[in-house]
Amino acid sequence: MVHLTAEEKSAVTTLWGKVNVDEVGGEALGRLLVVYPWTQRFFDSFGDLSTPDAVMNNPKVKAHGKKVLGAFSDGLTHLDNLKGTFAQLSELHCDKLHVDPENFRLLGNVLVCVLAHHFGKEFTPQVQAAYQKVVAGVANALAHKYH
């Protein structure tokens, strides 16, 4: 559960309504793979991830980034039940994929950076604070199965 004030919730949903999930998702996942290259080990089937350009232009990275942000969008409509919303994904990432749960926190922080880049002055410190709460809540929900 993420505790947001009415103002924070409004800021998150208003900005999210302007997000191009295809573009931002691919960029966020791509940046995760470039900035934290050890995360690439989970994406062996994605082909060429040998350079930053290869990662950022990789169609499989872009497609999976879109999928990730689609799940994140779903979470935004269930802020009061993030653990339930992400239960199946938590189980998949824990039991089958064996993803280090720290990667969820890293991706959340990268997403905040990408949103700041895309929205500039509109991404005020108050908006950032609200998004940091949300991405922390999502990361916690995704890591739930690990506990």
Swiss-Prot record:
Tissue specificity as recorded in UniProt: Red blood cells.
Annotated heme b binding sites: 64, 93
Q: Does the keyword Phosphoprotein apply?
A: yes
- S-nitrosocysteine: residues carrying this PTM: 94
Which stretches are transmembrane?
none
**What's a single GO CC term here?**
haptoglobin-hemoglobin complex
Mark the residues carrying the PTM Phosphothreonine.
13
Taxonomically, which superkingdom? Answer: Eukaryota
- N-acetylvaline PTM sites in chain numbering: 2
Q: In UniProt terms, what function does this protein have?
A: Involved in oxygen transport from the lung to the various peripheral tissues.
Q: Give the record's family classification.
A: Belongs to the globin family.
The protein here is known as Hemoglobin subunit beta
Species of origin reads Sapajus apella
